[in-house]
Amino acid sequence: MKSLKKKRRIQILVAAAVALVLAVGLIGYGFRDGINLYRSPSQMAENPPEAGEVFRLGGLVEDGSLVRGASETVTFRVTDGGATVPVRFTGVLPDLFSEGQGMIGTGRMEGETFVASEILAKHDENYMPREVMDSLKEQGVYQEPNS
């Protein structure tokens, strides 16, 4: 009788372990394309992304760098005070997107240019994404709003 209980207990533990491994595997598989790492221009200069890697780039849109093409293609440069990355985006920019303001773009590198598939801009004149604020503070160029 004890042997049967022990055998049943082991079967339950093995089944639970297999279910746990399957669940973790399915979660990892589901997130494989949904996790985009954030990088500042300085981080990209120090550790370039792998070819084809999708990631988020954030910083300030450099003054005087915004060029609107004849179509919906826009080019500009993003900086964090330490490094600058050229960006190309085809699509409609958010209404609050402008030079000297914070932005985060999702995309990948093509040569030396970051090709964005999505651009996010600040919410109001005082908002800045936390990642951008942290990287600007790290570079020593962050200024408090209204200062």
Curated annotation (Swiss-Prot):
Residues passing through the membrane, by range: 10-30
Positions that bind heme: 123, 127
GO CC annotation terms, alphabetical: plasma membrane
SUPFAM superfamilies in alphabetical order: Heme chaperone CcmE
GO terms classed as biological process: cytochrome complex assembly
Keywords from the UniProt entry: Cell inner membrane, Cell membrane, Cytochrome c-type biogenesis, Heme, Iron, Membrane, Metal-binding, Signal-anchor, Transmembrane, Transmembrane helix
Cytoplasmic topological domain residue ranges: 1-9
MF-aspect GO terms: heme binding; metal ion binding
Stored InterPro entries: CcmE, CcmE-like_sf, NA-bd_OB-fold
Topology of this chain in the membrane: Single-pass type II membrane protein
Localisation per UniProt entry: Cell inner membrane
Periplasmic-side positions: 31-147
PANTHER family referenced in this protein's UniProt entry, alphabetically: CYTOCHROME C-TYPE BIOGENESIS PROTEIN CCME HOMOLOG, MITOCHONDRIAL (PTHR34128:SF2)
Family: Belongs to the CcmE/CycJ family.
Cited function: Heme chaperone required for the biogenesis of c-type cytochromes. Transiently binds heme delivered by CcmC and transfers the heme to apo-cytochromes in a process facilitated by CcmF and CcmH.
Protein name: Cytochrome c-type biogenesis protein CcmE
Lineage: Bacteria, Pseudomonadati, Pseudomonadota, Alphaproteobacteria, Rhodobacterales
